Each structure stands twice: as structure tokens, then as C-alpha cells.
Amino acid sequence: MKKIVLCILVVYPLLSFGQIGVKAGLNFSNVTNTSSISHSNRTGYNIGIFLAPKSKSIISSKTELILSKQGYNYLTNSVDGTADLLYIMLPTYLCINITRFFQIHIGAQMAYLINAKADSKTASGSTSPVSDAMQYYNRFDYGLGGGVEIHPFKGLLVGTRMNISLANLYKDAASGQVPSFASVNVKQNLFQIYTGWHFGKQPASSNKK
């Protein structure tokens, strides 16, 4: 009973301050500046929570805490393989309320890498995991993002977003890195689709359309 009361005391002020909610969806991620290899999108997931302070104006804001699995598939002259990366992401967006049902998001994000896996497959079909793959990647990432979000009814939301990383994915062009690059200027792009639910009453926008 005490735990329930404590949870109510913690959550209620958040509800009065703004809308909190949950969201989950799919990631389609890839890399850029990789002329030495062929690469393709890798599908992952995103799941997390958000806080959107209440606002009746056209401009509002939204902060999220997201667990995001992303990466890419690659192909060289001799091997192909995958890279899987797991991040904790902290995006913050400026929300433009076109109507009470439709928002445009523009903002930035930071991310911290908590796990990394990579492998390579030879022409013979044998797959070799990369030992201690985390050592090759930069832990911190940052970039810009933008997208749209629809609020069709009640607490439901559906959205899409594009994130462009400004940080190098790899620390350096280290020997033994899989796949290997002549330059470390490799960056990530991430396209997300998601759905979610926000709790608390949605404030009416000054734009009543």
C-alpha cells in the first residue's frame, strides 16, 4: 500500500506539469560516408517514455528517454555481415502545433551506446563474431532530428522521425575493426516510425482547426 501511495505522489505532479506517455516502434538505420563498402538498412526497435509540458500555444516542447536498437548491414569484396548497436537516447524537440491533431517536430538528441555487436560471414558461409566490438565505437552520439506526429483521438499518437548523426560512429580506423574503413568519418542515419499513448488531458491549442 505504501508503494502505491508513493507512486501516486511521484506521478501526480508530473501529470499536472504535463503529459507523460509511452511509445514504441521500428527503426530503419544505416550509415553514410562509407565508399569502401556496400551497406543497407538494418531494422531495429525503439521504446521509451516522454514528457510534454502542457501548452495552449502553437509552440510546445517534448523530451523523451528512448532505448533504441539500430545498426547496418554491410558487404565487402570478401565478406558480409551486420553491426547491431543499442543506445539510450535523450531527444528534445520543439513542437509546432499546426492543429490540435497534427504536430511538426524539430530538435536535437544525445545518445549513449550501451552495447555493440558485429559479425562477418565469409563466402564459405562461416560467421565470426567480432570480439569486444564496443572498443571500436564512440560511446557518445549527438545529432539533429525532425518529424511529424498525429494525435487521431484521445491519448493515441502516431509519428515518423528522421535523425541525422553529427558524430563519428567509430573511434579510429583501427586494425581488426569489422568492417574496416579508410576513414573514421562514418555517421548514422535513423528513420523511425512509432505509436504511443499519452496520459493526462490534452490541452486545447490556440489553433482550433
Name each model-derived stretch:
Residues H39-Y45, D84-I88, N138-L144, K187-F191:
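Residues that define the transmembrane beta-barrel architecture of outer-membrane proteins
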